Curated annotation (Swiss-Prot):
Protein name in the entry: Ribosomal RNA small subunit methyltransferase H
InterPro entries according to UniProt: RsmH, SAM-dep_MeTrfase_MraW_recog, SAM-dependent_MTases_sf
Similarity comment: family membership: Belongs to the methyltransferase superfamily. RsmH family.
NCBIfam families: 16S rRNA (cytosine(1402)-N(4))-methyltransferase RsmH
Alphabetized UniProt keyword annotations: Cytoplasm, Methyltransferase, rRNA processing, S-adenosyl-L-methionine, Transferase
Lineage: Bacteria, Bacillati, Bacillota, Bacilli, Bacillales
EC number from the UniProt entry: 2.1.1.199
């Protein structure tokens, strides 16, 4: 069953200031919670394009959103190809785009997908199950140096070298096949006092491998850069991030977009072409309420950032 607790549901969609006849994009369809709430605000002229690279998510969303079938188009693609996919369908500009960058709970919870360090399964971790690169390939074939790099950069793991060394030692004996084996390796590599602190010892390493398998950070950067070029004046982008790496990328891109070009010295009035094209809709990121956190603990690290294209 495809259950998914939508995070910052109202805030994310409401911050788009939805026009009933507007064209919108849900870049991360997932459990379709944001899509359903947004579709509810559209009239017959309005339309939503919903992206997901996971066919299971699309199949479930089609059932969930059956009442809105004439107002929604489902596109099976990584959101980094959003602009191309929309252009192919004759869409050059949109009124709003939303991103929920969390891994949807069903993917984490389905044992056979191999995302979870709580359940033993084949090492997979692919969002798009048609792609070739899997967690098993990363763990067994990537070099010691590459493993250290991803564990440190994507997992912010202090014990990257120790974990990479233990992986290298084990895979020389036989291939590492399952998430359970990987958890055992991580527990062996991390010193006992550190294992007892800060949640599950596999959390950071699993995050790093998942990001590497799906090129998540590259996709976020590509997609957001293109999303900014798709917005109509007055249009907005809402982005929910769940860890510091994605939040850093989003924050940096938004800050850069809200800067105008460098001004020549001594101008009495700033000409329009020197004014920025974008502004931040909120000075600080929006975070979940205490009430939401009580309902859904996975929302704890969520941050919502919103940018608007200025009408000139």
């Amino acid at each position: 069953m495809f259950k998914h607790e939508t995070v910052l549901l109202h805030e994310t969609v409401d911050m788009l200031e939805v026009k009933p006849d507007g064209i919108y994009v849900d870049a991360t369809l997932g459990g379709a919670g944001h899509s359903e709430y947004l579709l509810n605000k559209l009239n017959e002229q309005g339309h939503l394009f919903a992206f997901d690279q996971d066919q299971t998510a699309i199949d479930n969303a089609k059932m969930k959103l059956a009442d809105y079938s004439d107002k929604v188009t489902f596109i099976k693609a990584n959101f980094r190809y959003m602009k191309e996919a929309l252009n192919e369908r004759g869409i050059e500009a949109v009124d709003g785009i939303l991103y929920d960058l969390g891994v949807s709970s069903p993917q984490l919870d389905e044992r056979e997908r191999g995302f979870s360090y709580h359940q033993d399964a084949a090492l997979d971790m692919r969002m798009d199950q048609e792609q070739e690169l899997t967690a098993k390939i990363v763990v067994n074939e990537w070099s010691y140096q590459d493993l250290i790099r991803i564990f440190f950069q994507y997992g912010e793991e202090k014990f990257s070298k120790q974990i990479a060394r233990e992986i290298e030692r084990r895979r020389e004996v036989k291939p590492i096949e399952t998430t359970g084996e990987l958890v055992d390796i991580i527990k062996t590599a991390i010193p006992a006092p550190a294992r007892r602190k800060g949640g599950h010892p596999g959390k950071r390493t699993f995050q790093a491998i998942r990001i590497a398998v799906n090129d998540e950070l590259g996709a976020v950067e590509d997609s957001l850069e293109k999303a900014l070029t798709l917005l109509k004046p007055g249009g907005r982008i809402s982005v929910i991030t769940f860890h510091s790496l994605e939040d850093r990328i989003t924050k940096h891109l938004f800050q850069e977009a809200t800067k105008g070009p460098e001004l020549p010295p001594g101008l009495p009035v700033i000409p329009d072409e020197y004014k920025p094209d974008f502004k931040l809709a909120t000075r600080k990121p929006i975070v979940p309420s205490e009430e939401e956190l009580e309902q859904n603990n996975r929302a704890r690290s969520a941050k919502l950032r919103v940018i608007e294209k200025i009408i000139k």
